[in-house]
Amino acid sequence: MSNDLFAGIGVVPGTFLLPRPDANWTAWACVACDQYTSEPEYWQRVNTLVGHQPSTLRLILPECDLPAPPERIDAIHAAMRDALNVLHPGVTDGFVLLERTTSTGKRLGLVCCVDLERYRYDGAKTLIRPTEETVASRLPARLAVRNGAPLESSHVMLLLDDPQRTVIEPLYARRGQLSPLYDFDLMQQSGHARGWAVTSDTDKSAIAAALNRLKDALGADPLLFAVGDGNHS
């Protein structure tokens, strides 16, 4: 299916790499690099839990470890190259429907690719806008990790005002008809995650149509997505 349906709405389908089915998914998935910045003991526990297993822990630079020497960046890039040996395209030209269960309830989401041409952090009235001021001092480390990186493990979370629940919930209601991708416990009592592949032209067209309706209802200079987390990523 052509991505023309998604032109101008800020997100598009993508290819998403996932670990092989027999991998330790609990060890693979860790929290974002900007969490637990004042709790190095949390990251020490995660490091012990992960050990030598493949993990996104090795692909990020926790902010509690800043400043980082150049060799730390080199090690992250080496870990990314190693990870390519255990990852495969879980979804091609599609989305991932996500369900995360925590102690406070259930959250639904849609993993997608973000059109960065629709985002600015300098106060411009773009389709995608930040929710906090960008701290320039936090950017160099992120840029160093991305410079020459063979993988991207972004933790950006976009918020969408959809009071009628027209984008994600229809997919979730028929999740039994979608191909399951993963179903596992998250580390450190962080809850449980399940994911399903969204790849059919019918489903992608429905997503695009719903987002376009929301955008059209906003009038001039629409704010369709707010960056709820990952403003610096």
Residue ranges and their predicted role:
Residues M1-G191, G195-T202, N212-P222:
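N-terminal extension/subdomain marker
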Residues A206:
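Catalytic-face loop-and-helix region of soluble metabolic enzyme cores
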Residues L223-S233:
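A sequence-level detector for short glycine-anchored, His/Arg-bearing signature motifs
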